[in-house]
Amino acid sequence: MADGTYRFQQPGAGQFFFQTQQQQPSHQRHLVRNGTNSPTGRLKFSHDTPSPSRSPPLGQAAALNPFTMYSQTHQGQHVLMNGGQAHQRFGMQMPKFQSQSHHPHPAQQAHHHTHHNQASHNINHQHNFSSGALAAATPHFTPSHMQNGAHANVDEDIDESMNEHWQQQLQLAAESRQASSPHYYARAVAQQTKGIQIAPSQPEPQENGGDVKNGLTKVKASPRQGWYALDFGGQGLRALSTSLFSYDFLKELYLNHNKLKALPQTIGQLRKLEHLDLSGNDLTELPEEIGMLTSLKKLYLFDNNIRTLPYEMGYLYRLDTLGIEGNPLNDILKSQIMKEGTRALIKYLREEMPENPPPPDRDWVILDETAGTSTEKITVLSYNALCDSSATQSHFGYTPSRALSWEFRRDVILSELRSHDSDIVCLQEVDQGSYNGYFREQLAYNGYKGVYWPRGRAMGMQEEEAKSVDGCATFFKGTKFILLDKQMINFGQTAVRRPDAKGQDDIYNRLWQKDHIAVVVFLENRLTGSRFIVVNAHLYWDPAFKDVKLIQTAILMEEITKLSETYAKWPACTDKTAFRFSEAEGGEAQTPPEPAPSMEYSSGDQIPLFMCGDFNSSPGSAAYNLIANGRLTEEHPDLEKRLYGNLSRVGMTHPFKLKSAYNSIGELSFTNYTPDFKDILDYIWFTSNTLHVSALLGEVDKDYLQKVPGFPNFHFPSDHIALFAEFVVKGKKGKVVEADFGPQRN
């Protein structure tokens, strides 16, 4: 498993000498700690020990055994005589772990370990056998036997008066202590697969070249990963190579029975790890980065010198089994796991977790040094706030409950909005109750006015019930802008009203049922007369509905096109005076600047357009390409040959020259960050013929992210991050319309 390419010599298919029955000598780490029962002792001889001269029971077929995870094109014969090693040990070379001549099969992937009654440890080794061959395999090593032939039943050492949680600890600790020989788990798997005849595996077809049709590049298929586990057990290791942690695909890692005194911080890179065995080392503490391993289901720390655990282990919300027996653990933590088990201890660490120091502020990235002299600048912020009904412990089990509560998160969101003081703010996932009872009132103190619509489902609900329905809220500075018009686009309802929707089943079965919306506001700058279309959208999330997201985007662009042509003919605004409180007595009244006349635009695509929101589409997706390129043909694979009227028959187009604001720096690393998902979903789009971006809010500090597996947390109140950009309005292509403002001062 971890001894390099030549881990075992491969003898011919000759006579096999089965090991004799022999008691394994006690390991030095079998010392009794903390008053526990002896982990060793003479065990009864098992009559089920397999014989080389007799066929095994049918129930022990390898096809029914969790060790079956191999797909190599050679016979896996490994001679182990009386527990000795019939091979020459070679130095470990990490790059050699992946055998070049093997054809891996993804169906045989890592499975988590079973507990008491089946003390098997299934490891993905670089030697893989196909499932077809394993169906007729005969294992020479059964889960109920240790490698030395001793039976794995240690129930005699367990006090039945103990509760089930601590009984499990003692059971697993005893099993761990008997696994101290070098590469114990790898050899167990080798025994399992002895004598298997392998059918040649079929190579996976690979794409040659790339398809750039419709602006979407098809990435060449990557080879499948055929092994997922490494066994470095019993090697006497005192340190670990940093190259080990570049194998971020690993699901199982065995470092048991070595001489490690510390675990590197880079352990946090193995985020797919499900089983980590560190038993029988000299560890005194764990690094905070252990909390990054949110996929962990089993963490074995038996027989170390650990006295306390880092609070970051509270992030390990999937951890089922924490093996801590044989450590001088402090009484508080030990009582938690003894009385209530692993999950209770992890919850305790999560809920008691102190608030860590906040990260450094995100950098303000200046793209245009000359923008400071521009006559007209505008700032725009977009933020998916994660509504209260979606922020549940089942979805965000790694977040402390007090950091997940809406009362806490809304205050952090409000504080961030006020700190940026953006001219325009677009929020998604804001429920009606929070908009009317909190954000509208609080942001009014900062000079904001708001426009809000909930999602379509709120229409048929009672008033109190509808308060929990989320929607899109757009705020703008009332002293800077005049609201000329506001509209709501319901994608599903708009689709069924199309003349070409008749007989198109997919519109009704897939699109109409989704009640996602976009809010459109038409604004005018009081001083300059420039007009802006601001779109705030939230699209469907499910990756299995790529066609729905694409059609929602197409409908959005189609409706914006219609509205923009209407707005191009919008009459001039005659009353631009902003409301002002009367001056206090004795105060000098400041004369407001003279407002410029309203701008008129020759066509809808000449009006500056901002399109913000959570589009749930990453760069390169069909929805992204439609917005960025202005067209998408009817043959796009994301449509899956579904019927959406003219949109799927003719194709999709729009007249705007849209560009993502963050494309100026190659997009952010992510806009959505959770343990299982990290991608770019949110955008601020702008029309590049009327605007250009001059500055952006940069990345989240990378050092901070090394210890944070996902958002929300105490510093980031949503699983999304805020996007914030500054724009400069280009020279106006429209003509000035003189408006009658009444009598003027001389």
UniProtKB/Swiss-Prot annotation:
Record GO cellular component, one term: P-body
Residue spans of the LRR repeats: 249-270, 272-293, 295-316, 318-339
Described purpose of this protein according to its UniProt entry: Acts as a catalytic component of the CCR4-NOT core complex, which in the nucleus seems to be a general transcription factor, and in the cytoplasm the major mRNA deadenylase involved in mRNA turnover. Ccr4 has 3'-5' RNase activity with a strong preference for polyadenylated substrates and also low exonuclease activity towards single-stranded DNA.
Residue ranges, compositional bias (Basic residues): 102-118
Keywords of the record: Cytoplasm, Exonuclease, Hydrolase, Leucine-rich repeat, Magnesium, Metal-binding, Nuclease, Nucleus, Repeat, RNA-binding, Transcription, Transcription regulation
The organism's place on the tree of life at top rank: Eukaryota
Record GO terms (molecular function): metal ion binding; poly(A)-specific ribonuclease activity; RNA binding
PROSITE patterns in the record: LRR
Family listed: Belongs to the CCR4/nocturin family.
Coiled coil: none
One GO term (biological process): DNA replication
Name this polypeptide is given: CCR4-Not complex 3'-5'-exoribonuclease subunit Ccr4
